[in-house]
C-alpha cells in the first residue's frame, strides 16, 4: 500500500492514516484541513450537507458525527449553522447532534429540478460544506465504491455545489441571467468545502486527474463535483475533526470533541438506524473500524496541538 505524502503538520499525518485501506495516498491533500479552517474563520451562515445512503433505508455512520462536531465548533465561533440531507438520513444526523447537546436545526432536502437554487436562495449560506456525501460521476450517476448506483436513495444535493461553482465563475455573482429560475436570482455563491475518503464524494472533482490514475473502478466512480477546498482523510469523519482541530489552533479555543463524546456519537448514529457503510451492519463501527479506534484518533488529534493537555478529558 502506498503512503500519502504529507508535510510536517501532525494533523495531516493523522488524517493520512488509512487503516481501512481506502487507498487515499494517491489523492491526499496536505494542508487541506488547515486551508479549510482558515476559510471558515468569520463564517456567517453555514449549510452542512451529509448522509450517504448505501442501500434503501441504510444511511451510514460516516458523515453525521463529523457534521455534528464541525457544526458545533462553527456555532461556538458565532456562525449560524443548519444541516440538510435526505429524509432517511436525518435520524442519525439528529442523533449525533443530540449526543453533543446541539440544536437539531436540520431539514430534508426538497424534490424538484429547482431544489438547489431554491435552497441556496432561501438559506443564503456564506459557506457550503459536504461531509461524506455522494457526488455525481462523469456519466451523471451516483456510484458506490463497487460501481453500483445509489442514485435511487440519494437526492442530487451536489447540484448546490455545481450551482455555486458556476455562480462564483460569473463576474457579477448577484446579477440575474436570462433563463435561470427566479429562485436562483439574488444570492451570492457560498465558499464550498468537501470532505471525503473514497473519491466518489462531493469535492473529489478537484482531484479528478489524480483519481483517473488510480484503478479503473476508482476512475469510473470518481466524482466530478469540485469545491474551493477539499479535505481527504482515511475516514470522512476524521477530515471534519481535522478541520476542527485546525480551528482550535487558530482560535486557541477547545473546539474539538473528546474521545468519550466520539463513542456517544457513533452509538447515537447506530441507534438512530445508521449502518457501517462497508459491512452494512448495524453496529458501532465506521468503515469497519471500531468505535474505540475512532476515539483513539480523536485523542491523538487533541494531543496534536495540546487541546486535552489544556483542558483535560471530559465525559
Label the model's feature ranges:
Residues 95-168:
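An acidic, phosphate/nucleotide-engaging active-site surface
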Residues 82, 107, 127, 191-195:
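Hydrophobic/aromatic beta-strand patches that form the interior of the parallel beta-sheet core
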Residues 78-79, 165-171, 185-193:
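A short helix->loop->beta-strand "cap" motif at the edges of active sites that frequently abuts
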Residues 79-88:
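Short internal beta-strands
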Residues 60-78:
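Histidine-anchored nucleotide/phosphate-binding helix
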Residues 52-54, 133-136, 198-199:
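Short glycine-rich anion-binding loops that position phosphate/pyrophosphate groups of nucleotides
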Residues 199-315:
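C-terminal functional extensions of proteins
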Residues 1-45:
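Positively charged, low-complexity intrinsically disordered leader regions
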